[in-house]
Amino acid sequence: MSIRFWVVAVLALCCASAAVAEPNAHELWVNVGGFSSHFNSSKNYNENNAGIGVEYRVSPQTSVMAGSYYNSIRHTTTYAAVNWQPYLLGNVKMGVALGMMDGYPSIVRGGTFFAALPLVTYEGKKLGVNLGIIPDMAKVNGAFVVQFKFRVY
């Protein structure tokens, strides 16, 4: 996918999110990628998934994110997603991330595809972490993923 696609996708997500935004709920986070731990450890995956991205929280339950990271099969992945986390327990949010990503040759030859994964988030005043589970599927070896983030606004 082209850069233009990702710019349009992120702008569309932000505009849609702003329409349902709650007052005083806006937060901007920068993430630096993270780590993965694959269920099948015999395949020599890269589990240090450094990257850069942004996440904009528009309500206690909803945020939009976009970024890029070095994935488990040593390719660059670009993504854009909406995180819907309706279950809150203090600073812990639980729900799902829904979005588009690329960079995995076994899925649509490395092109863009839809992805959904369960997502648990902890957000403190300045530091946060997203925890996800990628399930085992036909062409996907599952993993636990951890993404670290820092609040900038």
Where are these regions (language model features)?
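Solvent-exposed loop/turn segments connecting transmembrane beta-strands
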Residues: 39-47, 68-78, 88, 102-113, ...
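Outer-membrane beta-barrel proteins
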Residues: 17, 21-22, 58-60, 83-89, ...
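Outer-membrane beta-barrel "beta-signal"
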Residues: 30, 34-38, 141-153
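Short glycine/proline- and aromatic-enriched beta-strand/turn motifs that initiate or cap beta-hairpins
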Residues: 20-68
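Cleavable N-terminal export/targeting peptides
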Residues: 1-25
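Outer-envelope beta-barrel architecture signal
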Residues: 24-28, 60-62, 76, 90-94, ...
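Transmembrane beta-strand segments that form the barrel wall of outer-membrane beta-barrel proteins
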Residues: 30-38, 62-71, 93-106, 120, ...
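Residues on the lipid-exposed face of transmembrane beta-strands in outer-membrane beta-barrel proteins
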Residues: 32, 52-56, 80-84, 118-122, ...
